[in-house]
Amino acid sequence: MWTVRQAVPKDLSAVMEIYDKIIDLFQEQTGTRAWRKGVYPTEAVFQAAIEAGTLYVGELDGALAAGMIITQGTDKTYGDAPWQIAAEDAETAVIHTLGVSPGVGKRGLGVKMVEGAVALAREKGWKALRLDVLEDNAPALRLYERAGFVYIATKAIWYESTGTANFLLYEYVL
């Protein structure tokens, strides 16, 4: 059985284990520089997200299998992107750091996490979900396009884990 729920403090170690596996796989198979151990995402990032109520986890048959951070408002690094709809920060949210444990891959759990984010957005009355994806992260690009996100623009954005790099901005209008 699959469920998406808000994370609680006892989830932290399992979440870190999932993301460590994802980072290892990224570096081994794809070469993408999206995330780096000790840089992003870190235990402190997930701890802060749990405390803020913005970390969500996916459970498969009672075991944690995925995670994502959803924050209200559009990320300021997106600048003046040509979004499909005009909306105030209170009417939008951004999906960050969505990841599925490599041990449970190929079951559509990434799409199910996005569906959970869409359901949360509808519940909160948000008008759009937005996100950025590093241009060489082909698995994430496929996931978001398959889930109904629309490409908006490519922006050079600086993150500690990547330095300045091209990110593709996507939007899902609710």
Where in this protein do the model-derived segments appear?
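Conserved acetyl-CoA-binding loop-helix of GNAT-fold acetyltransferases
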Residues: V100, K106-A119, R142-R146
